Amino acid sequence: MRAQYVSDHIEGLDEPLLENPRTQIFHESPKKIVNKVDSPDLGMAYSMNPYQGCEHGCIYCYARNTHEYYGFSAGLDFESKIVVKKNAPRILEQQLLSTNWNASPIMLSGNTDCYQPQERKFQITRQILHVLAHYRHPVGVITKNSLITRDIDILQDLASDKLVQVMISITTLNEDLRRIMEPRTASSIKRLKTIEELAKANIPVGIMNAPIIPGLNHQEIPQVLKAAADHGACTAGMTIVRLNGSTGQLFQDWLSKNFPDRFDKIWNQICSLHGGRVNDSLFGRRMRGEGKIAEAIDQLYRISKKKYFAGREMPPYDLTKFRKGGNLSLF
């Protein structure tokens, strides 16, 4: 990777930091920004990552392992060495202008949160949305940051043609748990207010209650879904925790430090979801788990979704609006 050291501080965070790692910014100029998603577990065929690494610092994040491809660690480096892809909007436009490209929803993002704190400064996600709106191309956004409300103007424009679906991730309503598990993220109250603001702006928005960790947050499923529905969410999703690669050891250390009295129970329950391991790459099972605990969690989720989201749904995309080939370049 061709990278350049730029800055060594954190700015623009929604919440106070429990720790203060000195953030380093690296620039990368990729030749490709739209990635084909081969996983049948995910609802979209393509994803796009304006950044690599994430200052949010969620201990369970499956994307931590991808930072090792850059020669960084999956631990503190993932949270404090952020790769910025400044040319992403231009590369995206080149992709959309290709005669071989056919409209298909692109997810922001796959291995990062596109509204993490550095987005305040670099505004790459906003530029990407501007490109997508110009070419009337469908996009999905998943985030746990209230910064998304900054871009309501573009999201409204996309929503007017059924070109956007937003999912706000809420793992817990317990702020004590949120602060140690997702230390540099927006509070659950801010995320619920974000859902409300987007819904009032007629932007289709749902709740992603993920990941579900038995013994930590599984019992909150009904409360989380109800709160999201009360604030205007039109649908809900859920995934089970999976701890692949280095993430497993990081989570194990975190769990033993913060919940020593419950460590064995929680760890063993996570293992029971994935055939006796915390590492699971099997399509289908990895996102839902298996066994009695997984079945109980799934039943609780389905009952809660039926109760609080009856008659609601995420509107489908309209792929016919895509301006194939475009006219004049934005750049």
Region locations from a protein language model:
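Short hydrophobic alpha-helical runs that function as membrane-insertion/retention elements
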Residues: 140, 206, 236-238
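Glycine-enriched alpha-helix->loop->beta-strand junction motifs that scaffold or abut catalytic
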Residues: 160-163, 204, 231-234
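Conserved Radical SAM active-site core
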Residues: 16-52, 56-167, 171-179, 187-200
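A structural motif corresponding to the C-terminal end of an alpha-helix
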Residues: 131-137, 194-205, 273-276, 300-311
